[in-house]
Amino acid sequence: MATFKDACYHYKKLNKLNSLVLKLGANDEWRPAPVTKYKGWCLDCCQYTNLTYCRGCALYHVCQWCSQYNRCFLDEEPHLLRMRTFKDVVTKEDIEGLLTMYETLFPINEKLVNKFINSVKQRKCRNEYLLEWYNHLLMPITLQALTINLEDNVYYMFGYYDCMEHENQTPFQFVNLLEKYDKLLLDDRNFHRMSHLPVILQQEYALRYFSKSRFLSKGKKRLSRSDFSDNLMEDRHSPTSLMQVVRNCISIHIDDCEWNKACTLIVDARNYISIMNSSYTEHYSVSQRCKLFTKYKFGIVSKLVKPNYIFSSHESCALNVHNCKWCQINNHYKVWEDFRLRKIYNNVMDFIRALVKSNVNVGHCSSQESVYKYVPDLFLICKTEKWSEAVEMLFNYLEPVNVNGTEYVLLDYEVNWEVRGLVMQNMDGKVPRILNMNDTKKILSAMIFDWFDTRYMRETPMTTSTTNQLRTLNKRNELIDEYDLELSDVE
């Protein structure tokens, strides 16, 4: 069992405060929680194991045994995980509060050590100091933490994590915050704790302390779509489905600016127990709208593009072409269940075809053209440089004419009514016969921004907001979209 989990198991028997704070799921209890193949460290009990999704943020950071408590590091309730979670900027004073909490919950003194030794020796053949019997006394106090960057906030989940060398399949990365504190002071704390242990255990304690307090921080990982579970969605088959979030709260709401002060509540045991007795849960339905999910969807669309359509003469829109091996697209992919992506794909391809037909003498959709390789990138609006380069290459392929230092292309081929409306909306109420580079970029981006305006999107889904932020957005009625009514961003 993990050292931190062992310590919680044994120390929770000390007093009423510890029994409330150090409650973790035991490994010998089977729980009907979905196990995933994601390997990493459970933020609740710090053990390395298979992780399942959190019902508070949709990230994979909880093991099957701890999932029964539904704790999230973004909760308002000051449970142990929340008290170990800090937000940047972390000050020396904040770390002092964390260390004081550790000393309060996991004390080591002569009386306590003798109590644990006598408890172990009551069992047969346990006169030796085997490490597995005294694992709970071998947890040093370190500033080892797992970190993650969510929106503009960096979170640090302090704890004692074993097996740091193992594969990490989560977006959380190990950092050492020893430089934010005094190295000698931390050494002194641990040497004092260690002095109460038998010599054999002192050696192991020292080895663990230095290995977990002198390591180099790893670089931060970038979040990806696969880091978030789909299990919180109301309807996994609906692309506009809301996500159900559950957060643990308390009656006395703590402001986010006091985030790092949560660990200091443990000092007043009576007050802390009173606060925990007022705990309750809040449920929120939030939109999955964010750049991370949008980038993922458009990445799939870009791989399914049939660029030959822009040279074709098919009367039907791009997604409805049949019996043409060059233009027919496989529309059975789940991504096409999103009506917004269907509209965008059809409109962008129709507009590009109008530009090509207006400026280039082409024959049939079976022709092989150099511009094909840039067409998929026209849907990668989140990758600004790549998207701009694709538009420029398309524009140059159309052989623009230079007029007074500005290059123009023609637009005199028929477009569908929806594209016509979008062009008029962005070109002062009319459909121009000639377009320059900026006009082309403006129209193509507008077709995507009409439904996915990435300029004003969050980077990550709202499930990564703090409980106070969710509460505020809910009061403003800003947690959900109107996409189910087929209303666009513009409307």
Swiss-Prot record:
Q: Which UniProt keywords apply?
A: Host cytoplasm, Host cytoskeleton, Host-virus interaction, Inhibition of host innate immune response by virus, Inhibition of host IRF3 by virus, Inhibition of host IRF7 by virus, Inhibition of host RLR pathway by virus, Interferon antiviral system evasion, Metal-binding, RNA-binding, Viral immunoevasion
Which Pfam families does the protein's record reference?
Answer: Rota_NS53 (PF00981)
List every stretch annotated Interaction with host IRF3: 320-491
Q: Which GO terms describe its cellular component?
A: host cell cytoplasm; host cytoskeleton
Give positions of region: Important for cytoskeleton localization. 82-176
Where is this protein primarily located?
host cell
Chain spans, region RNA-binding:
1-81
Q: Which residues belong to the signal peptide in this entry?
A: none
Q: Where in the cell is it found?
A: Host cytoplasm, Host cytoskeleton
| Short motif pLxIS motif, span | 485-488
Metal-binding: is it a keyword of this entry? yes
Kindly list the GO molecular function terms attached to this UniProt entry. metal ion binding; RNA binding
Q: What processes in GO biological process is this protein linked to?
A: symbiont-mediated suppression of host cytoplasmic pattern recognition receptor signaling pathway via inhibition of IRF3 activity; symbiont-mediated suppression of host cytoplasmic pattern recognition receptor signaling pathway via inhibition of IRF7 activity
- Cite the record's note on assembly: Interacts (via C-terminus) with host IRF3; this interaction leads to IRF3 degradation. Interacts with host IRF7; this interaction leads to IRF7 degradation. Interacts with host CUL1 and CUL3.
Q: What is known of its domains?
A: The integrity of the zinc-binding domain in NSP1 is important for degradation of host IRF3. The pLxIS motif targets host IRF3 for degradation; however phosphorylation of NSP1 pLxIS motif is not required for its activity.
What name has this protein been given in UniProt? Non-structural protein 1
| Provenance organism | Rotavirus A (strain RVA/Cow/United States/B641/XXXX/G6P7[5])
Q: Lineage in the entry?
A: Viruses, Riboviria, Orthornavirae, Duplornaviricota, Resentoviricetes
